Each structure stands twice: as C-alpha cells, then as structure tokens.
C-alpha cells in the first residue's frame, strides 16, 4: 500500500498526459479519439478516488507526498502532495473530466484529435497546480494550463473564438511574468523553490519588508486575474461565451482561488493581512456588480459569466476574511460551484446545440417538451442559489456566518444582498427558458429531451449536490485538516531539516472568530 500511496499522485499526472499523447497519434476514425480520451479520464478519476479512501484525517501536513531532486541548478524538485485543502479539488477535477468529454461527444466533429489531446493536457496541468509543492514545478503547470485553454477557445469558439482566446491569454499570461520574477527573487534569497521551506524561511527570515510586499503583490495579481477578482474580469464574459462547454465547466475559478489560499496566504500571511481590507471591498463590489449585470443579460452564456463573477467574489470574501471557518466555507463553496456549474453548463450546452442560440428571449415553454432537462436544470439552479438541503446552502451559510462574526456585519449584509439577487436572476432564467408561452423558435422545433447517456452523466451531479447538502461533515472533515493548524510534524518525504506545515499553519492567521 505504501508503494501505491507514494506513486498515486505521479500516476494521476502521467495518465492524462499519456492519454493526450495516445490521442495525438491515434487515427481519427470511428470516434476513436473520443473513446481514448473518455477511457483515460475514467481511469484518472478512479485514481483520484484512492486519495480520499486512504487519506488519514488525524494526520497533519501533506500526504501521498513525493520529494525527489529533478534539476540540480537551479534546485528544482519533483515535490508533490495533497492535504485537506487540495484533496477534494483533485477529486473534483477528476470527476469533471469524463463529464466534459461526454458533453463534447457529438458537438466536436472536426479536429477531434486536437481537441481531446489538448483537453487531457489541460487536465494534467490542473492536477499539477493542485499537487505541486515546488514553486517552479507549480509555475510550470500554471503556465501549461493557459496554453491549451487559449488554443481550444480559438479553434472551437462559437462565433469569435480567436478574439476571446487572445483576450483570455493576454489577461492571464501577462501577470504571470511578474509571478516568475517573484519566484526567481525568492530563489535568489533562499536557494529554494520548495513551498514548505519557503513558508518557514519567510515567516522566520529577515527579508526586506518592501521587497516582500512586491513579491506578495506579484503572486496576488496573477491569482486575482485568474479567479477573476473585480475589476480584473475583462476576459470572463467573452471566454464563457466562446469556450467549449467542456472547458468552461472544468476550469471556472478553481485554480486562482486555490492558489490564493495555498500560496498567497500560505506564504505571505502578513502581506495578506495588509491587503485583506482592500480585497474584501473588491469582493463585495464584485458580488453586487456581477449579480446586477447578470440580471440584465439577454445571453445565457454572459449571464453565467457574471453569475460566476458574483459567486467567485463571495468565495474571495471568505478567503480574505482570514478566519478558519471562512476558509472551510471557501473550499466547500469551490467544490459546490464546480459541481453546479458543470451541470448548468452541460444543460445550457445541450439547449444551444438544439436551438443554435444563446439568446434567452428565443426560448420559452420547454418544460413540457423537455421535462427531464427542466427538472435537472431546476435542481442545479436551486443548488446555485443555496436552497437548504443542497450543497450551495452549506457553503453560503458558512461563508456568511464567518463574515458576520469575523469581518463586518455591513459587508455581510451587502454580500447577502448579492446572494438574494443571485436567486432572482437564476429563477428568472428558469422561468424564461422552460416556462411561460412557447416562443416561435421552440414551437417550430420538437426538441430532444435527455437520452439515457446524458441522464447517466447529469444524475450523479444532482445526487452529489444533495449529498453535499445533507452530509457536509463528510467533506468538511478533510477540509478542516488543511485549514486548521495541527502540531508541526516531520515530513518523511522532505529533507531532514524541513518541517511540513499545512498551508494554513501560520501563527499570525486563523486567530479570528471561528
């Protein structure tokens, strides 16, 4: 079992990479690339399930850890591991990959080899971001995640893919240059890219305060653009409008939010505390701004983009509230957001494929024709707006309660107003698409309800929303080990003179109200 535990993260990284290479060399006939990609994604998902099955809740620090020298100069290590912060995010990424492939099964008809190879490469990069504990290794995966996504948007966009891809690439790539400079500065000062080592040296070292502020700002800028945090959201609506459904449902928000928690707060707690009031204010503006713009959208892709801005801003508020309970709620809501958005994007993609428009006023009265589609769309909508007994309620309740007791009652009231507006625009979307009189478009086309294969993909997502709402302790038990500071423990996979700290084991943080 120890051999499996020591190699499981490497397998999770290598299997989708090998699948991408196999898709690239396979003949493009009889949907062979589709089947190779699906089999690869299912195997990878199965590997990710090993992590929660063998995760030790009472053990602090990183688990399934591997730390091996890779490049001697500069000293870059193959250092990977997971803790409660990243555990469920790895599983979520594994779950969404086969769902994304099924969602693309009949919509990607040309250059399928390119699509599925790049999609699996994107998955490799996402897994790498979540498990990397060497900052240069992390940076490599971070940059790798940008390239396949930009190419996929450019090649498979709906109307103006190249322009949306260029905007996405410039917005997200340019801030990565200061991040690289910051990493090199840290290496010049410490001789290490290792996250655990840097965490200790920064907290106990004698660095220039002004230089460290600039380094922390470079980290924050790269992550804030990727979330995105208001007002750095200029790429979001075009990307959601043009990105293939599989891509939009897989990547929305998770990488930037995780990186904020792991690397910005985890490495620079003092600097994070200094900028927290500003980020809290921007997050609340983003919650309300996104919700108000979502209310007036006529295009459902753009509505989903601004809804995402509002919901991701709520998670940002929880992160920079700097309370342990807020961090629990943030990670939980990232998971819920990933599940709910996957269901909504998949269902909206099916509607778009049938009716060839994303204009909301072109729809109407579809509940009678597409009852299964309508039912699952309503369930996903209720999950997004936070109905009790669904996962969205748990995440929003934890976030708002932690903000109320640990940050500001005024900010909490403003954030709660954004949540209420979220219910308004999502329920209005349901009403306009599925209820009321039929539009000329929907009346002229029979419409196809979900077939058994699509139901088999969507039903587990609906069940997962319910399980997350009814049994939150199952998920929170692992999350808490990643955000609560346990006693320091010696890592078996780290150098003998390095102590493993979980990402949140920072004495200057986590002192706010629980």
Q: Across the structure, where does each feature detected by a protein language model lie?
A:
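Central hydrophobic cores of alpha-helical transmembrane segments in multi-pass inner-membrane proteins
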Residues: 10-25, 38-53, 90-104, 122-124, ...
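Hydrophobic alpha-helical membrane-insertion segments
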Residues: 39-54, 172-183, 377-384, 420, ...
């Amino acid at each position: 079992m120890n051999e499996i535990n020591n190699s499981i993260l490497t397998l999770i990284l290598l299997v989708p990479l090998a699948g991408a290479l196999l898709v690239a060399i396979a003949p493009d006939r009889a949907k062979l690339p589709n089947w190779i990609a699906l089999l690869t994604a299912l195997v990878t998902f199965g590997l990710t399930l090993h992590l929660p099955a063998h995760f030790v809740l009472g053990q602090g620090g990183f688990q399934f850890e591997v730390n091996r020298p890779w490049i001697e100069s500069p000293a870059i290590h193959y250092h990977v591991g997971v803790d409660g912060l990243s555990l469920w995010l790895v599983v979520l990424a594994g779950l969404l990959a086969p769902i994304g492939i099924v969602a693309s099964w009949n919509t990607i008809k040309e250059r399928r080899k390119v699509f599925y190879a790049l999609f699996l490469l994107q998955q490799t990069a996402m897994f790498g971001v979540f498990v990397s504990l060497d900052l240069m290794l992390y940076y490599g995966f971070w940059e790798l995640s940008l390239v396949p996504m930009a190419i996929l948007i450019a090649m498979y966009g709906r109307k103006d893919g190249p322009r949306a891809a260029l905007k996405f690439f410039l917005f997200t790539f340019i801030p990565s240059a200061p991040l690289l400079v910051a990493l090199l500065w840290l290496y010049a000062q410490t001789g290490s890219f290792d996250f655990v080592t840097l965490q200790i040296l920064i907290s106990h070292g004698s660095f220039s305060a002004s230089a460290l502020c600039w380094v922390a700002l470079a980290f924050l800028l790269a992550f804030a653009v990727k979330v995105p945090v208001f007002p750095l959201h200029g790429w979001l609506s075009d990307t959601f409008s043009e990105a293939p459904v599989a891509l939009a449902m897989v990547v929305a928000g998770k990488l930037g939010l995780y990186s904020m928690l792991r690397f910005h707060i985890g490495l620079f707690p003092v600097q994070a505390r200094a900028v927290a009031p500003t980020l809290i204010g921007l997050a609340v503006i983003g919650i309300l701004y996104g919700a108000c713009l979502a209310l007036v959208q006529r295009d459902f892709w753009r509505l989903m983009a601004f809804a995402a801005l509002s919901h991701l801003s709520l998670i940002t508020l929880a992160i920079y509230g700097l309370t342990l309970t807020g961090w629990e709620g943030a990670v939980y809501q990232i998971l819920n957001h990933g599940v709910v958005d996957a269901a909504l994007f998949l269902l909206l993609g099916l509607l778009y494929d049938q009716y060839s428009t994303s204009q909301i006023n072109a729809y109407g009265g579809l509940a009678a024709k597409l009852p299964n589609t309508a039912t699952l769309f309503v369930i996903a909508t209720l999950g997004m707006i936070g109905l009790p007994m669904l996962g969205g309620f748990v995440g929003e309740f934890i976030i708002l309660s932690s903000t109320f007791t640990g940050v500001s009652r005024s900010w909490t009231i403003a954030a709660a107003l954004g949540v209420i507006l979220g219910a308004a625009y999502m329920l209005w979307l349901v009403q306009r698409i599925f209820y009321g009189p039929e539009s000329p478009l929907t009346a002229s086309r029979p419409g196809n309800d979900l077939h058994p294969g699509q139901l088999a993909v969507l039903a587990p997502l609906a069940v997962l929303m319910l399980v997350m709402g009814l049994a939150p302790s199952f998920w929170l038990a692992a999350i808490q080990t990643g955000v609560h500071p346990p006693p320091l423990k010696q890592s078996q996979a780290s150098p003998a003179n390095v102590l493993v700290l979980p990402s949140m084991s920072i004495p200057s943080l986590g002192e706010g109200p629980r």
